[in-house]
């Protein structure tokens, strides 16, 4: 089926490399960065500016600024056949025409979020322990994330359940896509894959790389080699 007419939920099935990036306001290179990362094989790209260097320097993104940044990411995602994700905000996801809305444990109830964004976009959920993971398997989210695998500066103060949660999730063999998240980089990726994950979310492994395209290519190759 042509990718242009595939639904996001169908494209999600093939996705294995999920990138969260801030708006890179202090660098002013969001378009170039996104193009490089997506050219390297990133399947989903999410804007998450909370706690970023740009937020510290310029303050929180206002809704209009967030939509402008998402427009840049959406353009790159279209050109590379990737999925665009919005974090937390169903209204922003709707306004941006996003493919994906990602919800945390304390965000909108699933049915409310679905009522806002409609049926086409996929919805994901963060999980941080075995109980939350079990709920995510049963509830009507399209995918979920498990972690953090390691403590991460993007989630300060959050305990890391570690690879045990990845192993437990793999043992459940969920009938929907799931991603390991939290502190994953090229060096740690083999441990994550050995624990049973075949999809990962990364941040600094690509956002802090001197060559984002090469970093994405290396991560994608390792995931693909794991089968």
UniProtKB/Swiss-Prot annotation:
Summarize where 4-amino-2-methyl-5-(diphosphooxymethyl)pyrimidine binds, as residue positions: 46-50, 87, 126, 155
Name of the protein this chain belongs to:
Thiamine-phosphate synthase
What EC number(s) are associated with this protein in UniProt?
Answer: 2.5.1.3
* Gene3D superfamilies referenced in this protein's UniProt entry, alphabetically: Aldolase class I
**One GO process term, biological-process aspect:** thiamine diphosphate biosynthetic process
Q: Which family does the entry's similarity section mention?
A: Belongs to the thiamine-phosphate synthase family.
Q: How is the cofactor bound?
A: Binds 1 Mg(2+) ion per subunit.
NCBIfam families membership: thiE
Entry-linked HAMAP family: TMP_synthase (MF_00097)
Query: Gene behind this chain?
Result: thiE
